[in-house]
Amino acid sequence: MQDLKTYLSTAPVLAILCCSFLAGLVIEINRFFPDALTLTFPSFEFFSSP
């Protein structure tokens, strides 16, 4: 069991998990908001000028 914990805590495994999560997140955002260059919601009105 100690060997499995050591393997799962190595940098390449953690990097692959992080990249896979981010890729899945980007895919899901593009599924719900297709062709959006920026993610804009109506509640983000503090970015616009008055």
UniProtKB/Swiss-Prot annotation:
The keyword Cell membrane does not apply. The keyword Transmembrane helix applies. One of its GO terms (cellular component) is photosystem I. The chain crosses the membrane at residues 7-27. InterPro entries: PSI_PsaJ (IPR002615), PSI_PsaJ_sf (IPR036062). One of its GO terms (biological process) is photosynthesis. Gene3D superfamilies: Single helix bin. It is found in: Plastid, Chloroplast thylakoid membrane. SUPFAM superfamilies: Subunit IX of photosystem I reaction centre, PsaJ. It is a single-pass membrane protein. Keywords: Chloroplast, Membrane, Photosynthesis, Photosystem I, Plastid, Thylakoid, Transmembrane, Transmembrane helix. Belongs to the PsaJ family. May help in the organization of the PsaE and PsaF subunits. This is Photosystem I reaction center subunit IX.
